[in-house]
């Protein structure tokens, strides 16, 4: 009997290990870490019925802990008993999947999400021991580095708030006397009245003296704690959301801290980063009270480590879509996103599915000397830029701090997104009828490239606008934005054309070592459906595998000659799984005529001849309108431009490369002992695409 019991226990232990291995294999993704326990379970009924949902949950030892969406069909559920085994939990979930009233039930695992601020590298070790117990002397944190601020002439609007004069980004304080022209919007009478902004983060201190009068409970909730109070835990680490909120809506004239960009706006916060973050947590945050909240500001995202591809899950993607379709009474929620802080690791925001979403307005950073900070990431989905800082010797962003204080050292792209949200609030007050697409149009049209032109990487797109992979269309200009908002007409309906590239045999195509391949599509503007003649967003969905994913570079060439580096090389990305239909996004061809030849250049910077993989497919998604965005905009010709059917800019680039290779071979042939030249293999592939409208 004793040995039988021992054998049973050993068998049970082995079975548990097998189940654990199977469990880990289910969630192998883009990282090598072990699979964590599910953090949330979402149950979705076929029809809305709260009473039935609670009854089903109770019958299975579960309880309802809120809803991720406003549709009433979806519910967070948790196991009442904390002692249930993993196997028992699986049995319950499996049984519920067969329930006739349940459409789906899904266990969700936590996702890695990082706030996009940082400690200055040269002082991080000094603050490590005290960062969890920050106290304030007067208004300013005594743990912050000493910064000598440049003093400027008194601002036009003499607010008595003690740190206002030090808010250089509002007071012509950047090099050359530049700022974001916010005072011009204020002088027109706009400060964000009747606009509600919600900060999706680690919570906000709603009773802060510089926020309390503007606090909006309808734009706030605590998803981590399952209640309505977004107050963060007082552990020293959860100040990020409060700081972001202060940038938007710090009260003006109360002789405390500084002044928010939209100091009359209503400000709320969602506590969602102070705990496990799953797809459903993100969806619930992005869906909160969408008919009341105008702007959602997020300064977080996946790891900025130079080796991760990650983005919103299916529920969060659904939340984005529902937001732009139904939010703000059908005008669309406005989602503002920080572009990322992985520049020092040569990361690209193209690998971040939040900044590459069509539905987000991605914002970058510039320093007081109008340069790119060391942490800045590059990608063609960035629309515009606001100010931040780069190191401890430069002034950073002034805002409120926890507990009940102020700070001079808010930084990173975390600081840039809330400034953009505040500026957008000014424009929405000027014209509340602006749709989410209207806002993207006027932000890129009024962005000012001039302060940032001394940086490398600027080019001109096919409609004459300056573009940059670091800064988008330039520095946001609040005054210009408000003035354009006042006269802006709602843009025509957006249409989408999809072109699928049909890869000829061999399919998939082998790729090895150091190579270059060019895949071209002829686009006719969707003649068989509603045409897209004036571009907005352009997406490329690509699938490939390669021995070292970070060695690949993807560049898209438009018919008008605009080149967008969709994916630069990322030296730290050693992943060999590749990507599957990843949605790369470019906003750099905005306004162009899409008709003509589009070319996707896929190349490798690998120095290893033996590394290889396969290229499977790619699709081109064109978002835009059949008519000009505004009545007075120039119209494209009804005939495909002759420059498209003739030699395109991409053809000239290809010919130049071939010419240089030919000259190099001729030089080598004249040598007594010719050197071995390893030229890139170039394969130009053209095919008629399959068109889906």
From Swiss-Prot:
Glycans are attached at residues 194, 433, 518. Residues 490-628 form the P/Homo B domain. One of its GO terms (biological process) is positive regulation of synaptic assembly at neuromuscular junction. Residues 167-482 form the Peptidase S8 domain. CDD domains: Peptidases_S8_Protein_convertases_Kexins_Furin-like. Residues 1-20 form the signal peptide. Its cofactor is Ca(2+). Its main location: secreted. This is Endoprotease bli. It comes from Onchocerca volvulus.
């Amino acid at each position: 009997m004793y040995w039988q019991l021992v054998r049973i226990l050993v068998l049970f232990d082995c079975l548990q290990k097998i189940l654990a291995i199977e469990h880990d294999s289910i969630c192998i993704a883009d990282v090598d870490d072990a699979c964590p326990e599910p953090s949330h379970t979402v149950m979705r009924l076929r029809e809305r019925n709260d009473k039935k949902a609670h009854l089903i949950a109770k019958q299975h030892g579960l309880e309802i802990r809120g809803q991720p969406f406003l549709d009433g069909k979806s519910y967070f559920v948790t196991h009442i008993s904390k002692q249930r085994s993993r196997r028992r939990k699986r049995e319950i979930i499996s049984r519920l999947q067969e329930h006739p009233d349940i459409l789906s039930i899904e266990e969700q695992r936590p996702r890695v999400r990082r706030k996009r601020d940082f400690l200055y590298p040269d002082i991080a070790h000094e603050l490590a021991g005290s960062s969890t117990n920050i106290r304030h002397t007067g208004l300013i944190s005594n743990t912050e580095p000493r910064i000598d601020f440049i003093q400027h002439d008194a601002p036009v609007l003499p607010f008595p708030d003690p740190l206002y004069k030090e808010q250089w980004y509002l007071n012509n304080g950047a090099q050359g006397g530049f700022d974001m022209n916010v005072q011009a919007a204020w002088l027109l009478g706009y400060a964000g009245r009747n606009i509600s902004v919600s900060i999706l983060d680690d919570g906000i201190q709603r009773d802060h003296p510089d926020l309390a009068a503007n606090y909006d409970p309808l734009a706030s909730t605590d998803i981590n704690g399952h209640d309505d109070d977004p107050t963060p835990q007082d552990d020293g680490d959860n100040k990020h959301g409060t700081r972001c909120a202060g940038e938007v809506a710090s009260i003006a004239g109360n002789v405390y801290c500084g002044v928010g960009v939209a100091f009359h706006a209503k400000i709320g916060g969602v506590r969602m980063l102070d705990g496990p973050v799953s797809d459903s947590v993100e969806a619930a945050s992005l869906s909160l009270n969408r008919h009341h909240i105008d702007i959602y500001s997020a300064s977080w995202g996946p790891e900025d480590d130079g080796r991760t591809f990650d983005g919103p899950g299916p529920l969060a993607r659904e939340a984005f879509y529902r937001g732009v379709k139904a939010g703000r009474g059908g005008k669309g929620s406005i989602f503002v996103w920080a572009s990322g802080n992985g520049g020092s690791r040569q990361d690209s925001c193209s690998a971040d599915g939040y900044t590459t979403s069509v539905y987000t307005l991605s914002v970058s950073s510039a320093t007081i000397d109008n340069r790119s900070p060391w942490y800045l990431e590059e990608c063609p989905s960035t629309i515009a830029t606001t100010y931040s800082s780069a190191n401890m010797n430069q002034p950073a962003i002034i805002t409120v701090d926890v507990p009940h204080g102020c700070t001079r050292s808010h930084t990173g792209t975390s600081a840039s997104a809330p400034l953009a949200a505040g500026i957008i609030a000014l424009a929405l007050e000027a014209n509340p009828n602006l749709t989410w697409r209207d806002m993207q149009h006027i932000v890129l049209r009024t962005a000012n490239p001039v302060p940032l032109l001394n940086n490398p990487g600027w080019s001109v797109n096919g409609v004459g606008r300056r573009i940059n992979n670091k800064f988008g269309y330039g520095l946001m200009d609040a005054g210009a934005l408000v003035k354009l908002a006042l006269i802006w007409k709602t843009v025509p309906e957006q249409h989408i054309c999809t072109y699928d590239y049909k890869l000829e045999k061999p399919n998939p195509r082998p790729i090895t070592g150091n190579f270059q391949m060019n895949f071209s599509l002829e686009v006719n503007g969707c003649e068989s459906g509603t045409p897209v003649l004036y571009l907005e967003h352009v997406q490329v969905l690509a699938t490939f595998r390669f021995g070292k994913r970070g060695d690949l570079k993807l560049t898209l060439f438009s018919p008008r000659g605009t080149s967008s580096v969709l994916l630069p090389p990322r030296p730290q990305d050693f992943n060999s799984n590749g990507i599957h239909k990843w949605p790369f996004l470019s906003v750099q061809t905005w306004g162009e005529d899409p008709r003509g030849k589009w070319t996707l250049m896929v190349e490798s910077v690998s120095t290893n001849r033996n590394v290889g993989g396969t290229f499977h497919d790619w699709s081109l998604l064109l978002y835009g309108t059949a008519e000009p965005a505004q009545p007075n905009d120039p119209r494209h010709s009804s005939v495909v431009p002759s420059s498209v059917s003739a030699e395109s800019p991409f053809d000239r680039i290809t010919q130049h490369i071939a010419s240089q290779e030919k000259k190099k071979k001729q030089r080598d042939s004249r040598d007594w002992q010719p050197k071995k030249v390893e030229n890139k293999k170039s394969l130009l592939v053209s095919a008629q695409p399959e068109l889906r409208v």
